[in-house]
Amino acid sequence: MRRVTLTQFLIEQQRAGRTSPDLRLLIEVVARAVKAIAVNVSKGALADLLGEAGTDNVQGEAQKKLDVIANEILLQANEWGGHLAAMASEEVEEVHQIPFDYPKGGYLLLFDPLDGSSNIDVNISVGTIFSVLRFPEGIQEPNEQCFLQPGREQVAAGYALYGPSTLLILTVGNGVHGFTLDREMGSFVYTHPFMTVPVDTQEYAINASNARHWEPPVQRYVAELQQGRTGPRGKDFNMRWVASMVADVHRVLTRGGIFMYPLDEKCRDQGGKLRLMYEANPMAMIVEQAGGSATTGRQRILDVQPAKLHQRVPVILGSTHEVERVTAYHREG
């Protein structure tokens, strides 16, 4: 059986008119950065890469050493390619401008360089999430406003999962496709064509320690799941929670389920916990392209109009029937 690499896959997408040459090359640069991040993640304590960096990110969260390293890898890899007008990182407050002596392109790249980094020191899977938007026409100098586009305007989205194997999951608006890093070849190999989220599920992912802070619709929904076979749902459900969005969403993508980080009293003033531009939008695009659904509980995530670069939102995504049920409970109040 012929092994198809990420490069070959993207060339075929370009030939079919689904991606532009610059978008293809941009995704390849991101993939090379992912390989470099994977090497650093795998070294861990051997290279003194565990623990905190002694700095805080824009959200006031303590940065891990690998947060800083992954962020720098992505910035440096993508600066010089000529495909980008600017970048935005979850770890950095301001828009990252392309150096003046490098060529500029027609795309904007947003990323969470190392999602789930609180798990690094205990050797649990972490990941990278990225999103690609078009740079609006008629603007000379990129600024924050250029990035404030609803998620439905994304031209590509993906994530890398650094686990027992390194996976790159990608959509360019033509389904969801998975690639596994062959470390001997040094290439991502096409291993998961047209991934789909099962419509029904018996698994859910939520941080149950926040139950007392949830809004009534979420409390009602989770209570029904916990009642299992003897409750209104008539079947047993299992709860899974990794505290790494990439790992939790990947499980939903591969075997079905629902992932929830809902609005609660702890994060109400912030508008939610997860970042719209760096986490919610790309994951929502991936899940919808795989046949699932993604909402805030009140609105389709991809229709949310961003007001600021580091905006937070509630996230409920996964198998369509479950997401629709939770959303209906929110409508009922």
Swiss-Prot record:
Q: How is its cofactor bound, per UniProt?
A: Binds 2 magnesium ions per subunit.
The keyword Nucleotide-binding is annotated on this UniProt entry: no
Q: Which InterPro entries match?
A: FBPase_C_dom (IPR044015), FBPase_class-1 (IPR000146), FBPase_N (IPR033391), FBPtase (IPR028343)
Catalytic activity reads: beta-D-fructose 1,6-bisphosphate + H2O = beta-D-fructose 6-phosphate + phosphate
Concerning Pfam families, the annotation shows: FBPase (PF00316), FBPase_C (PF18913)
For this protein, what is the EC number?
A: 3.1.3.11
- Name of the top EC class for this enzyme: hydrolase
Question: Does rRNA-binding appear among the keywords?
Answer: no
Q: Tell me a Gene Ontology molecular-function term this record carries.
A: fructose 1,6-bisphosphate 1-phosphatase activity
Residues reported in the UniProt entry to bind Mg(2+) 1: 90, 112, 114
Which residues are involved in binding Mg(2+) 2?
Answer: 112, 115, 279
In which family does this protein belong, per the annotation? Belongs to the FBPase class 1 family.
Q: Which named protein is this?
A: Fructose-1,6-bisphosphatase class 1
Q: What domain of life is recorded for the organism?
A: Bacteria
Subcellular location field: Cytoplasm
Biological process (GO) annotations?
A: fructose 1,6-bisphosphate metabolic process; fructose 6-phosphate metabolic process; fructose metabolic process; gluconeogenesis; sucrose biosynthetic process
What cofactors does this protein use?
A: Mg(2+)
- Cite the annotated pathway: Carbohydrate biosynthesis; gluconeogenesis
Assign the protein's first listed, main location to one coarse class: cytoplasm
- The entry marks the following residues as binding substrate, namely 115-118, 207, 273
Coiled coil location: none
Recorded hits in Gene3D superfamilies, A to Z, give: 3.40.190.80, Fructose-1,6-Bisphosphatase, subunit A, domain 1 (3.30.540.10)
Q: Which GO terms describe its cellular component?
A: cytosol
- Note the subunit structure: Homotetramer.
Q: Which CDD domains match?
A: FBPase
